[in-house]
Amino acid sequence: RYTLRLLTLQQFQRATALICAMEVLRRAEPEVWGDAPFTIGLWVGQRVTPNTTDESHAAIEKERDGKYGTGSTSAQLTRCPWCGSEIAPGRELKVDRDLGRTFVYCGDKYGRCEFSQAKSKNLGLPVLVVDDEIYRHPPSMLIATVDKFAMMAWRGQVRALFGKANRECPRHGLLWPEADCNGNHTKKGSLEAVKVKEITPIRPPDLIIQDEFHLISGPLGT
């Protein structure tokens, strides 16, 4: 399992550079490529990435205090895939608990990178590494371990990745019956008042690839 998870992480780091290139092109011509950002998600076990935004926030706070543990963390990138600048977990990772989002920024201290806080304050690098955030904002490309797919039988929110969502909150993304979002939201700080809306089922994944299948053994492989 360790070998498979390490391989998955390396694939994520390499593929993020591709998604960054796509997002740079989209931002340059939104009238051609649309307003929705291209994003990539990392969907692996709880020991690697957080399940919830609260868990992500707690892990980042520990890292800011210099307490690097062995638990899950949102710091899956050590350098910006676009420009190579260092990414410090305590400085370049931020959690917006009102939006329920974890943002990862490029560490370029001069603010020249397209994904630095100076140029991309509202999004940062187009990555999603927290399970709940992946369900609410399904990424353009998702890299996962096969055991996460096996959770579909008892985790209803996973269905959102396959288009099974009928409501959307402009602030929090797609909703499922057990979602924490309680519906409409009043204005809060810089956040505008929003209303939850009914939506038609979204498009499920066009392609699913099972890589390195020979590494899976036991009941899960069967």
Model-flagged regions — what are they?
Residues R1, T39-W43, R79-W82, Y105, ...:
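Structured core elements
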Residues R1-E23, G41-V48, A144-W154:
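Conserved Walker A/P-loop ATP-binding site and its immediately adjacent core
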Residues T8-Q10, N51-T52, S116, M151-W154, ...:
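Short helix/loop capping segments that flank catalytic or ligand/cofactor-binding pockets
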